[in-house]
Each structure stands twice: as structure tokens, then as C-alpha cells.
Amino acid sequence: MAGTITHLVIADRLLEPLQIRRPALFYCGNLAPDAIMAREGYQREMKRHTHFKDGIRLRDLHLPRCLAQYRRAFQSFTDRFLRPDSPDCELYLGYVTHILADEVFILTLRDAHVRRLAAEGRDPDDPAYFAAFGRDVDLNDWQLVREYAFRYPMPDILLQEQNYEIPGYITRRELQSSKAFIIEKNFLTPHEKREPEVFSYAENTRFIEDACLYIQKAIRDWTS
């Protein structure tokens, strides 16, 4: 799915359209769904749960029954947490923007790569191809770190919020542990600089544009 820095760039570009008042909390909410990987004994199915896709493989999300199941879980989360009177509403709004961006990523970009492999007579689930894809996600993220001008200083602003959790999904400890890992990996450690192999920076840039448009429409539809 989309890279961590790519998610943060999307969140950054949504600050003004969504009229975010607590940007640090919104950024942190945007990082939250993947923080489950900091859980002791982490297994892949746990991440499916935090992304509202219990039992759903990425390749199957487009199937009507899978998409309907995902949307029900999404609606359940928004009904529970996205209350305008909640002081943490923007934390959960950040969480939702991550999920919506991944939805766009899976149903458009990832599926396009799968179709391309199939058209070439190759295994649509080729492990080597998607290992290269994953490396390219990091390379594209690190180019964003070097080139994208965030509206607030990164990673400093991520440290302004510490006391938060996503009840029933991610604990405070997991969120803090994951955030520390993200900062170390993406902002403190020297990055490899080379051209992506299968997932280009231009392709990632187009995805960011598409995701921002989709998320704004989805949020407008939800609040109207």
C-alpha cells in the first residue's frame, strides 16, 4: 500500500481543504492505522483489521462482497468516532484519510500493476515483483522527504501530540513506538538514492493527486 511519507504528504495537502485546526493530531491520526505493526506478536491479519479489511486479500477488494464488507466496517468506524463535538475528531479524521488513500492505491494503482503482469503472461502475485514494488515505495517516500515542503516542520510536529490512542484498534504504546520507528527510518537515517524499478516517482505523484481529490469528495459526501 501507499508509503508512510506519501500518506503524510496527502494529509499535509488536505489541511486547508478539510480546515484542520490541530495539524499535529491530524498527522498522527494519519499514521495510526499502520502502527499495529508495533504490536507484540504482530500478524498480517491484525493490519487487515485496523484497515477495515478483515479476511479480505488486497487483490480481492474490488469484488462486490469484499467492497461491501469493507465499506460497512468503514461506516462503523466513522459512526463511532467521527463526531464533530469530539475533541479528538481530527485524530480520527486523519485515520480515515489514511484508509481512503489506501483504498485508492489498491483499487487503481496496485490493481493496474496486477493487470499489467497478467497481460504480460506473468504471475499477478509475483513475489519478486512486489518485493521490488515495496522497495520503490520507500525510494519514492525518501524522494518526498528530500523535495516536498511540508506546511509544518517534519518530524518535529509529530512529537507535539503524545497522549492519544484509537480505542479498540491501536494502543498508545503502539502508536508511540511506531512513530519513533517512522521518524528514525525516514527522517534520521541516511537514505538510498536510486531510480525505482517498477513503481515510478511520477506514478506516485499522480496517485497523491488522485487520492487528495477522492478523499475530499468522500469527506464532503459524509458531512453533507
Regions found by a protein language model. Name each.
Residues 1-224:
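N-terminal leader/auxiliary helical segments
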